[in-house]
C-alpha cells in the first residue's frame, strides 16, 4: 500500500490568515484560477477562459502526487513536490533520473533541474550546476537560458530497491527523511 500526499498553501504563508484557535494557515488557491484571460498569476502562468472562476469549480493545479508501479503492480516509487508551476518539471525529472538514469533517491532529488513555463516559448530556466556546454547547446538551438529566481521544486521521494526502500528529501527545501521501524 502507498499514499502520495501533497497539499499546498499556494504561495508562502498562503493567504496569510491563521485559523483562530487552530493555528494553521489558509491557502490562497484562488490564485490558481484565471481571474482574467491572458493575465499571469503569481507564478507567471497565463490563464484562459477554461480556468475562469465559477461556482463549484475546482481550479487547475500543478500538484502531482505520483505513485509509480512496477511491472508486477507493486509500488516502485512514491514522489511529490511543492513549487507551484515548477512541480510538474521537478517530479518528471526525478522520475526520469531514477527510471532512465538509475540514480539513487538522493541523487535524483539533488540533481540540477530545468523548467519551461510555456511562455515565452523560447525561455528555459534552470536550478543547479548544468554543464556550460549543455547550456550553450540550448542557446544554439534558440533558447534563452537563465537561472530560475527561486528553487525548482522541493521533491520528496521514496524508491523500492533490491535492498528495500530508499528515501530522500530535496536539499532545495526544508523537508527531511524519517525512516520508521
Segments and roles (model prediction):
Residues 1-148:
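Proteins synthesized as precursors that undergo proteolytic processing into mature forms
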Residues 129-181:
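Cofactor-centric catalytic regions
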Amino acid at each position: 500500500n502507498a499514499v502520495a500526499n501533497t497539499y499546498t498553501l499556494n504561495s508562502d504563508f498562503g493567504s496569510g490568515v491563521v485559523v483562530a484557535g487552530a493555528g494553521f494557515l489558509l491557502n490562497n488557491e484562488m490564485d490558481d484560477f484565471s481571474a482574467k484571460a491572458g493575465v499571469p498569476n503569481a507564478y507567471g502562468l497565463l490563464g484562459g477562459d477554461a480556468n475562469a472562476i465559477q461556482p463549484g469549480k475546482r481550479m487547475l493545479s500543478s500538484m502531482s502526487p505520483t505513485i509509480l508501479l512496477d511491472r508486477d503492480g507493486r509500488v516502485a516509487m512514491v514522489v511529490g513536490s511543492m513549487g507551484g508551476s515548477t512541480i510538474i518539471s521537478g517530479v518528471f525529472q526525478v522520475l526520469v533520473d531514477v527510471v532512465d538514469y538509475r540514480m539513487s533517491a538522493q541523487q535524483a532529488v539533488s540533481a540540477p533541474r530545468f523548467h519551461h513555463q510555456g511562455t515565452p516559448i523560447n525561455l528555459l530556466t534552470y536550478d543547479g550546476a548544468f554543464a556550460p556546454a549543455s547550456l550553450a547547446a540550448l542557446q544554439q538551438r534558440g533558447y534563452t537560458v537563465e537561472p530560475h529566481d527561486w528553487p525548482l521544486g522541493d521533491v520528496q521521494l521514496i524508491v523500492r530497491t533490491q535492498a528495500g526502500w530508499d528515501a530522500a528529501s530535496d536539499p532545495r527545501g526544508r523537508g527531511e527523511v524519517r525512516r520508521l521501524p
